[in-house]
């Protein structure tokens, strides 16, 4: 389904509840890039609405539905549930040819803080993972650009990130190793977030 659509979000949650009776972990991983990389001054409202609708609005309201289900369930291993938002290094790095994506991921970062603040007292923890350059379908069209950046040393760990790198971070947050932290993020970006001279 499309998490940008209300009916699809409701269908997703009800089918999971029907199958398992509870939701212990929500990973908000759905996301899209602009169909066309356009200069900020040329970006269309349609592109902005599409990216924000899926990446930010979808996350906001799927989390709302899941959090309400988590509030109704007993604690398991000292918590009622864990919500993990996959944002991006683009939450704080400017990319003027895909501004709508940057805005959407900055919004996901704020959603992490908002839901962490609201749900901490209820035993629901909320975390954020900020991937860097990960080898996916989304980055396949710009391989040459990122290969060049990697070769030029933009990333201290000089390689493409892999889906497994993100999955490892998700597993760590989903487990019970971070029971005294919420509203936080981890950069899984090969050190790209380090400001270097």
What are these regions (language model features)?
Residues 37-40, 44-49, 151:
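Substrate-binding pocket helix/loop in short-chain dehydrogenase/reductase
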Residues 120, 125, 181-183:
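Short, small/polar-rich loop/turn modules that mediate ligand/substrate recognition or access, typified
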